[in-house]
Amino acid sequence: DPGHCKSHKGAKANGIKEEDVNLDIGKACRNYLNKYSDVTVYITRTNNKCLKRLKLGDCLTARNHLAKRLSADSLVSFHINWDPDKKRSGAMILAAYNSGYNKYVSTTTQALGSSIMANLQELGIKSEGFWFRTLDDEKYKNGAKADYYSIVREGVLNKIPSLIIEHGYVSNKSDCNNYFKTAEQRKSLGVADAKGIINYYKLSAKNIEGDFQTISGKTYFVDKEGNKIAGWVKKDGKWYHFNNKTAVMN
């Protein structure tokens, strides 16, 4: 879930717009995960349009409602942070706290978040750990205070582990220069997120039997049953990507 959109803009500083960075991170994460089997990846947005168009609630709650409709195993929301203290830097995980309500959700968000953070740290990003925040005026059915952040709270209510990854601070020049400035830097963040997800769920790389076919000048990968394969395919030790809609080699 790439956070924000053109209508609901995120943080902005040092020439960086959060909604743009989030989208690049999300796409990179999706593309890397598509190399693996036993996983179906959905992305809440592929452009900067508002998610209200899905008719699943407002832009924020539509993200959780989509995950619920898809019976998702988890929802990972990509963000970058901002703070008035321009020296503050590092990544942070916003996860469900141990409220005792739908306990599986808090346990999973914390374990999955730890796996993702470990891979972000390998890029040199400082870890600010977990941030747990609650509401004073809303409670879960067991009487415990509800989680503050909508993505996290709705995940608890829907029994779908939902967490937010803050990849660093747009207000910090060093974080911007090292992690947000270029497309390759943003891709690295998305790949790190994907590796954390892969490690947590113990996913295996795809190895599809089949071969290349050229039809009307366009190259496809066709499996043994004659199906054109989209996404990433490994052939003779090399990875090839085929358009997710047309299945044509990119």
Which functions belong to the PLM regions below?
Residues Y42-T44, W131, F221:
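General small-molecule cofactor/ligand-binding pocket signal
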Residues I80-D85, G129-A205:
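Active-site-adjacent mobile loop/cap segments within catalytic or ligand-binding domains
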Residues K206-N250:
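Extracellular adhesion/carbohydrate-binding repeat motifs centered on closely spaced tryptophans
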Residues V41-I43, L75, I151, S162-I164, ...:
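Conserved beta-strand scaffold positions in the cores of enzyme catalytic domains, especially
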Residues P2-L112:
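Catalytic-core regions of hydrolytic enzymes
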Residues K103-R133:
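Acidic, glycine-rich loop-and-strand cores that form catalytic or ligand-binding grooves
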